[in-house]
Amino acid sequence: MKSNLRYGIRKHKLGAASVFLGTMIVVGMGQEKEAAASEQNNTTVEESGSSATESKASETQTTTNNVNTIDETQSYSATSTEQPSQSTQVTTEEAPKTVQAPKVETSRVDLPSEKVADKETTGTQVDIAQPSNVSEIKPRMKRSTDVTAVAEKEVVEETKATGTDVTNKVEVEEGSEIVGHKQDTNVVNPHNAERVTLKYKWKFGEGIKAGDYFDFTLSDNVETHGISTLRKVPEIKSTDGQVMATGEIIGERKVRYTFKEYVQEKKDLTAELSLNLFIDPTTVTQKGNQNVEVKLGETTVSKIFNIQYLGGVRDNWGVTANGRIDTLNKVDGKFSHFAYMKPNNQSLSSVTVTGQVTKGNKPGVNNPTVKVYKHIGSDDLAESVYAKLDDVSKFEDVTDNMSLDFDTNGGYSLNFNNLDQSKNYVIKYEGYYDSNASNLEFQTHLFGYYNYYYTSNLTWKNGVAFYSNNAQGDGKDKLKEPIIEHSTPIELEFKSEPPVEKHELTGTIEESNDSKPIDFEYHTAVEGAEGHAEGTIETEEDSIHVDFEESTHENSKHHADVVEYEEDTNPGGGQVTTESNLVEFDEDSTKGIVTGAVSDHTTIEDTKEYTTESNLIELVDELPEEHGQAQGPIEEITENNHHISHSGLGTENGHGNYGVIEEIEENSHVDIKSELGYEGGQNSGNQSFEEDTEEDKPKYEQGGNIVDIDFDSVPQIHGQNNGNQSFEEDTEKDKPKYEQGGNIIDIDFDSVPHIHGFNKHTEIIEEDTNKDKPNYQFGGHNSVDFEEDTLPQVSGHNEGQQTIEEDTTPPIVPPTPPTPEVPSEPETPTPPTPEVPSEPETPTPPTPEVPTEPGKPIPPAKEEPKKPSKPVEQGKVVTPVIEINEKVKAVVPTKKAQSKKSELPETGGEESTNNGMLFGGLFSILGLALLRRNKKNHKA
């Protein structure tokens, strides 16, 4: 009994121990698996390349007993399959040597995996793209000075975009254009601080939210900053001062505007932008035409400009000096300057070049940096005054061969000991100025001796001009509860114009004057006549005030100014001072200095005042006494008794075949004073002279043909007229009209023509009084009727009856239905990236990751094989050496880096863990079986 009991107790202990041991094995293996997975979950994968924000210059990852450095060089293979966990470069002063690690070493750190993603490349911009399993990393090249500056302070290259690109919702309205510096010309001279201006008018569509953005791109021959080192564009503000959108420059020629909260509750958004664009001297190095383009979406605004540059100042022998301010940093008070010195193969000796800040200098500053380069290239120097001095194939540094001295105000003095007369020289200056000064001016002076001690003395000045940009926008509040929905306003515009009617009529044209009183005085003047017909010449003077102004300078051929020039008899000598008018600078203020070019002469401005009186000019000419006999009666007929007529008849000489001379003066309050002159010759046919006064000019008809002749002198017409001859004069624009053979020819002249020859028919001269002119009739007894109405003059050939009908009903233009806009396909929005918290100062225990949506399992991410890397000794800090040999690459904004929230990946020990759990489970089952058996035995 006791034996069985002991056996049962032993079996009871064995069963309980088996159950306990199996449970511990299962629990222990589960915790080991979780810990193993947590060790590898410190890698954040970037889905696509994005612009990296530079972080601190030195960072370390520390654990309890060890220091972990993560190093990464800048040369990666395009076929690499490993995605680096982070791009951190760590540098400490205690590092005894440099270590280059081609791969990223991942170590165990007591930090959450999300913290590691906050570390970025310091000093180098890296673009990362990950198509499937291939990762290619290309560093962005920076100059050495920029890399040094990054170690001192944080530099942010580009703000990451979080909104949607809504460029397709921006409509460029009519009136958007690019205008030149001067309105009346397309010539732009950057050396005179001239620039072009982009004027945009935008209308934005619906559905724009805060954070959305749009871009537009400039052509490579312009940029937005001029000589300024700042890259900025104005904000778009509403009329009440609220910011609608902020602007930034991406790269060099891409402008982006990002909308703010103002647009949330607005509709019908519009904006206008006025942005100064400066000619880029690095790309437009020579004079000529340039096509400036700005592209927004599918809309391009462009214009061609003629770019000109100043050639500098030169003496009589061709020696030239030129210069240009290249960059200006108002924050640090620094600027740089290029200067050209061209000997032009002249024998110069003791050549000295000095540079001095004449306005805006800052006393007590450090010495500037001055470098002298000899141009050894085969091409000419850039007319834009720019040089890529690091090109050793074109420029040779000869600074050490010169004698260089500095003064206390940032100036320099440079002596050319061995001047190569066949080469040109470029001087690069980098110095300081007072950024609080209102003006900045830099002067370059060249002095040298020719043979026989003739001198070359040249001065060139460069100044700075400041420009400002502006932008404004507006919008209407959205209606929260609209009264009418789906209503589209329809704007209709009707324009009606009467049709233009043209008619031609052949035959007699009658003009009738209405019976308004006309008072005028008409005087005749005598002019010499040649031939057989010497008649009275009428001259009419209008009572229009004549303004006359002239300059009373004596001994001068100039109209406005007198320029006195004084020349030195010393060939090649003399002081020549020229100011290069202004260099562009982009700033919010508009103050600055404008200077002009001055050569070796004096310009005197005439300050005299001249007064010219405008008086009425009256001309009265009397005819001389006339002698002769008239063969036949002379009649004077005056009608209607409503006018006063003074007619002095002279003696008629010659033979008139028809013997009767009639003067008929017609009605309606006309005061006429006229005198007849000599009339001679023979008239074999009927001749009529008709004159209307539409614009005080006669019209002559010869043989039924209309001839319009324009000339300024008096023509002479000779010959015989065998048929009916008529002369008609209209005064449409003080020009006579001649008709010959049915062809219309317009002739302008200012004086009355002379008509000579024999007239075999009766001659009739008809003149109406519409414009203060008398009416004469010779050789006929028929009166002349003048009728004038308000109808326009009608001329031409009509062989049949003509009816003119005028329709006064305006044409009805049917409204054009509005064409619905088909919106373009929207671009795929980029999902926002959650912010990654910064790394804490102290390590925290790992926290298991919980899926956001329970019930939906997340497949584990595929683990990429890790290549072994060089081990790092514990307790030592390594310093990476970064070799940057690639050019600066523009950063393309893409999707932000974000951590993949997925299940923990499988580790290498998962299979052994499962076996252990199975073994523990079997132990527990065995223990339970023993306990059950013991219980049965105990009952038995």
Curated annotation (Swiss-Prot):
WR repeats lie at residues 815-828, 829-842, 857-870. Residues 1-36 form the signal peptide. Residues 908-940 form a propeptide. The keyword Signal applies. Residues 38-92, 792-802 have a biased composition (Polar residues). Disruption phenotype: In a double fnbA-fnbB deletion, cells adhere to host (green monkey kidney Vero E6 cells) but cannot invade them. D- repeats lie at residues 681-718, 719-756, 757-795, 796-814. Changing F278A: Loss of fibrinogen and histone binding. GO terms for cellular component: extracellular region. Residues 36-111, 676-746, 764-878, 892-918 are annotated as: Disordered. It is a peptidoglycan-anchor. Pfam families: Big_8 (PF17961), Fn_bind (PF02986), Gram_pos_anchor (PF00746), SdrG_C_C (PF10425), YSIRK_signal (PF04650). Keywords: Cell adhesion, Cell wall, Peptidoglycan-anchor, Repeat, Secreted, Signal, Virulence. Residues 811-860 have a biased composition (Pro residues). It is found in: Secreted, Cell wall. A motif (LPXTG sorting signal) lies at residues 904-908. The fibrinogen- and elastin-binding sites have been localized to the N-terminal region. Interacts with host PLG; this interaction provides active plasmin on the surface of bacteria cells. Interacts with host histones. Multifunctional protein which promotes bacterial attachment to fibrinogen, elastin and fibronectin. Also promotes the accumulation phase and the primary attachment phase of biofilm formation. In addition, protects against the antimicrobial activity of histones. Mechanistically, captures histones and prevents them from reaching the bacterial membrane and simultaneously binds plasminogen, thereby promoting its conversion to plasmin to destroy the bound histones. NCBIfam families: LPXTG_anchor. This is Fibronectin-binding protein B. It comes from Staphylococcus aureus (strain USA300). The gene is fnbB.
